[in-house]
């Protein structure tokens, strides 16, 4: 455990270093820390011995080690902090017309990436928690059709498929009827379970040959089990990490799994400093924050960047963007649920 003065010194070194990326000497600390230069140097030496500070090769100053940044995050960083100077810029960036949910999530991801210079990832509500609230089949031709699904009464998902060779028109009607009777109003996780248990038994009552029918069910509904992921600033990862991080960001489903695992049960926000279970994220920092998607649940807003990032500003931007995005989504869903009328 370090003393209060040593904690203040570490915090100040972290603050100064993340602003300038230059080693910090005792004279720079004396302007804020009410102690002699010798006392400050002695405390810096103790912090270095504890592995929280590192010597610079080109100067007598010190800089935070990865362990030092982690200590700062765990003991001094407020995860709910907001810098009012950033509020105006975020609100201004969100001043655009959105025609669908994906527009807003993609825009928010770009805003966070552009304002930090790092990589941002936004996830929609976890698939397992969404509900199937609408289903229809539109026959496009003699040989293909379109399954139109609605999640949470607002999110459309479409899957085009080739009609099985042995299907007649009545078979498509039966397919739709089974979905409406057994799967409609179920959560996605329940649909996954029913496709393995109930549906095979039900299908036998409607179809003589069931193999291609069960394959059709799997094909149509597999889309529901995928995370909706929006990545921005992927190329920025090359400035603070190696190629493995850049390549990992291409695997959006695995990215989503890793980010969800970074939050413990019941947590609304977390900061991992070189502490991810995923090897491609093991040498970076990951900020993760839940934001409200009204009427549906929580999305996930994440920032991936270097260990020596400005944590206070990064946390502030994540918080502000999360709040502004939630407000924008609230307006969007209220509009969808209201009576539409034209204003002249």
From Swiss-Prot:
Keyword presence, Hydrolase: no
UniProt GO MF annotations: DNA binding
Family listed: Belongs to the HrcA family.
N-terminal signal peptide: none
Name of the molecule in the record: Heat-inducible transcription repressor hrcA
Purpose: Negative regulator of class I heat shock genes (grpE-dnaK-dnaJ and groELS operons). Prevents heat-shock induction of these operons.
GO biological process, alphabetically ordered: negative regulation of DNA-templated transcription
Superkingdom: Bacteria
Transmembrane segments annotated in the record for this chain: none
Key words of the record: Repressor, Stress response, Transcription, Transcription regulation
Stored SUPFAM superfamilies: GAF domain-like, Winged helix' DNA-binding domain
Pfam families for this protein: HrcA, HrcA_DNA-bdg
InterPro entries: GAF-like_dom_sf (IPR029016), HrcA (IPR002571), HrcA_C (IPR021153), WH-like_DNA-bd_sf (IPR036388), WH_DNA-bd_sf (IPR036390), WHTH_HrcA_DNA-bd (IPR005104), WHTH_transcript_rep_HrcA_IDD (IPR023120)
